[in-house]
Amino acid sequence: MATTAAPAGGARNGAGPEWGGFEENIQGGGSAVIDMENMDDTSGSSFEDMGELHQRLREEEVDADAADAAAAEEEDGEFLGMKGFKGQLSRQVADQMWQAGKRQASRAFSLYANIDILRPYFDVEPAQVRSRLLESMIPIKMVNFPQKIAGELYGPLMLVFTLVAILLHGMKTSDTIIREGTLMGTAIGTCFGYWLGVSSFIYFLAYLCNAQITMLQMLALLGYGLFGHCIVLFITYNIHLHALFYLFWLLVGGLSTLRMVAVLVSRTVGPTQRLLLCGTLAALHMLFLLYLHFAYHKVVEGILDTLEGPNIPPIQRVPRDIPAMLPAARLPTTVLNATAKAVAVTLQSH
């Protein structure tokens, strides 16, 4: 038994030639198992490669579909021709109209929202406006402390429009035929130009003179100061007397000017500053009333002559009888009358 086992063991160790092929197969099988164990696990990367490949295929399909759609649209546009161009143009016009309507709606909404900003400046009772109109004609005496100025624009704005209407009424009653648009524009430009321009100029001087007044207060003060101008022009446009105009110019216009001057004096420190500021305001305010009474008609008549030409009646030659007594020449009147008539007939024939 022992002797039999030894050759078997020796044969397993490679001593016997008959076991050579079997041992090679076993060794080959062992190397195969070891190689499989030592191989990298590439199964995950293989799935990732498949996913990327699938994604590329889908992208290529999408690009192909987009190219086909573009080609189809191009073919349709070429096939439709002018019809396709009109359709595209109509879409663009509709888009532009929509955008324009949207912008207008937003502007209207913003304008309505901005009305609330101006509402405090026009929120005033009629009784307050009436009392302020009367106070604008009464000069104040106490100028030691700053006088109160109404911070609203309803009364001044209505007075400016009233002055425009009075100017139009004056031109209606002056037997002057003009074009309504030209007259309206001239009157509005004159009144609003004076109100806004002089208020800005006086406010600038007040800033230089260190006066305690704001632009809103200056507009209100000068606007209520036009109440005297409205009274004077309304009366003198209906009663054409220069003496009456000068009387109202000094009394009514002077009272309204003194009221404004007193308010500015109470808000200005220093005699030189008071003289400069108040003297400028008084001169501009009184001269503006003179301008409205005298120069305004000439301006409108000049516009009328420019638009329609001067209205000059034609010259007519009419023979007249010479008076019976001529101190310079002692000639018979019958001879002179006959001679004059003959000359007139000769001129008319030519």
Swiss-Prot record:
- Upper lineage: Eukaryota, Metazoa, Chordata, Craniata, Vertebrata
Per the record, what ranges lie on the membrane's Lumenal side? 170-187, 238-240, 296-350
Give yes or no: UniProt keyword Heme: no
Annotated family: Belongs to the YIP1 family.
Q: Which residues belong to the signal peptide in this entry?
A: none
According to the record, glycans are attached at 333-334, 337, 339, 346
Cross-referenced PANTHER family, in alphabetical order? NATURAL KILLER CELL-SPECIFIC ANTIGEN KLIP1, PROTEIN YIPF3
Q: Can you say where in the cell this protein is located?
A: Cell membrane; Cytoplasm; Golgi apparatus, cis-Golgi network membrane
This protein's major location comes to: membrane
Q: Which UniProt keywords apply?
A: Acetylation, Cell membrane, Cytoplasm, Differentiation, Glycoprotein, Golgi apparatus, Membrane, Transmembrane, Transmembrane helix
Q: Name one GO biological process term.
A: cell differentiation
Official protein name in the record: Protein YIPF3
Amino acid composition bias (Low complexity), ranges on this chain: 1-10
Q: How does it assemble?
A: Interacts with YIPF4 and YIPF5.
Instruction: Tell me the segments the record calls region Disordered.
Output: 1-51
User: Tissue range of expression?
Assistant: Expressed by nucleated hematopoietic cells (at protein level).
Transmembrane stretches in the record are 149-169, 188-208, 215-237, 241-263, 275-295
Positions in the Cytoplasmic compartment: 2-148, 209-214, 264-274
Function of the molecule = Involved in the maintenance of the Golgi structure. May play a role in hematopoiesis.
N-acetylalanine sites (modified residues): 2
The entry's comment on post-translational modification says: N-glycosylated in the ER (40 kDa form I), then O-glycosylated in the Golgi apparatus (46 kDa form II), the C-terminal lumenal region is later removed in the Golgi apparatus to produce a 36 kDa form III. O-glycosylated with core 1-like and core 2-like glycans. O-glycan heterogeneity at Thr-346: HexNAc (minor), HexHexNAc (major), Hex1HexNAc2 (minor), Hex2HexNAc2 (minor) and dHex1Hex2HexNAc2 (minor).
Q: How does it sit in the membrane?
A: Multi-pass membrane protein
GO cellular component terms, alphabetically, are: Golgi apparatus; intracellular membrane-bounded organelle; plasma membrane; transport vesicle
